[in-house]
Amino acid sequence: MNDIARLQLVAELQRADVDFDDLQEIVSRDVGLSYNLLRFVNSAFFSLPRRVESLRDALVLLGLSNVRRWTTLMALASSQDKPHELLVTGLIRARMCELIAQATGERDKEGYFTTGLFSVIDALMDTSMIEVLRSLPFSQEIIGALLNYDGPKGRVLHAVLSYERGDFDELGALPAGSSAVELYAQAVEWATQASGGLGAEPAADAA
């Protein structure tokens, strides 16, 4: 899948109005994506009580939001000329943003996950962030967070990137009583397991 086709697929998956039937139709168009999704759903990462044999089964068992999340990840992971570590970095950021949102009682945890994940989309697509975002149906809140660290999601993303760089004076978005080290370690552990299921290399140990 070339970059244009991949971006078009991701844009379809990220539409706010995507429903159960839409998602099944989008995924079923790509045999490789369908196969990889079913293989991943049946992996040890999910440890489901029974084998999933169809896309509809996957949707029923995991729910629309989860299937959309993992299908988007697979589409992003399909680039053959990018290091796996780049996707793993996106997974770590996504999970840490989500964990911070969860700790602060934010309702839109999926939006925080998406913000963290797509913070690497410019590197994955070899183009500027603003150009990529023109093709994606994101809310202005997520666009502002990715471009300028605006709003609550932007502040959380900025804190995650600051921790990544070792700039520990810029962690103001972390909830009181939370340990950045602990949250990052949880994110790395999750990303390691998830990337293994997606066929990526394991994440490096947290420093």
In which residue ranges do the predicted regions lie?
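Conserved alpha-helical "signature site"
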Residues: 1-207
